[in-house]
Amino acid sequence: MASYSTNEFKGGLKVLIDGNPMVIVENEFVKPGKGQAFNRVKLKNLLNDRVVEKTFKSGESVEAADVEELTTVYSYFDGDSYVFMHPETFEQYMVSEEALGETKKWLKDQDEYQVILFNGQPISIIAPNFVNLEIIETDPGLKGDTAGTGGKPATLSTGAVVRVPLFVQTGEIIKVDTRTSTYVSRVKD
């Protein structure tokens, strides 16, 4: 199995720590005036999304995680798990609701998602940065009603709720940023 030295650490690198796959979020090289240099690293656990901070002595090695990212298409929900299919090999991946996490509110049939596999098992799903979804319920915007924030809540076809401008109506399709859960624009047909 491959390993990484501390001088190869950078954001996005996937490593194995105590048997858990982790991704490096932040890496800071520290060279004190006295003593050995070290790396202060923030790591995000890919299994439970917890962020931990660890320090590694300069020159130390860490095992690479057997993590694979695949582009897949969301197919359907079979009652227990969500089924994603690889578009070229047609291989299906069953993903539990726990592994899906917050991405569940952005699931739309036939959209592409990144499936993260650890030892061949799906452990998490990454939604695209932007999705186009239909508004199924929102209050009508009243003309001149801008005393508040200038926005209103809207329920989308997936069940997610986002704040939208007053001019947006039920039945319209909007573009949403999945990273921040915010309205971006209306989608023209």
UniProtKB/Swiss-Prot annotation:
SUPFAM superfamilies reported for this sequence: Nucleic acid-binding proteins, Translation proteins SH3-like domain
UniProt KW Disulfide bond keyword: no
A single GO BP: peptide biosynthetic process
Taxonomic superkingdom: Bacteria
A molecular function GO annotation: translation elongation factor activity
Assigned GO CC terms: cytoplasm
CDD domains reported for this sequence: S1_EF-P_repeat_1, S1_EF-P_repeat_2
The entry's keywords: Cytoplasm, Elongation factor, Hydroxylation, Protein biosynthesis
Free-text description of this protein's post-translational modifications in UniProt: May be beta-lysylated on the epsilon-amino group of Lys-34 by the combined action of EpmA and EpmB, and then hydroxylated on the C5 position of the same residue by EpmC (if this protein is present). Lysylation is critical for the stimulatory effect of EF-P on peptide-bond formation. The lysylation moiety may extend toward the peptidyltransferase center and stabilize the terminal 3-CCA end of the tRNA. Hydroxylation of the C5 position on Lys-34 may allow additional potential stabilizing hydrogen-bond interactions with the P-tRNA.
Subcellular location: Cytoplasm
N6-(3,6-diaminohexanoyl)-5-hydroxylysine modified-residue sites: 34
Pathway membership: Protein biosynthesis; polypeptide chain elongation
HAMAP family, A to Z: EF_P (MF_00141)
Record family assignment: Belongs to the elongation factor P family.
Chain's role: Involved in peptide bond synthesis. Alleviates ribosome stalling that occurs when 3 or more consecutive Pro residues or the sequence PPG is present in a protein, possibly by augmenting the peptidyl transferase activity of the ribosome. Modification of Lys-34 is required for alleviation.
PANTHER family reported for this sequence: ELONGATION FACTOR P (PTHR30053), ELONGATION FACTOR P (EF-P) FAMILY PROTEIN (PTHR30053:SF12)
Name used for this protein in its record: Elongation factor P
Organism: Francisella tularensis subsp. novicida (strain U112)
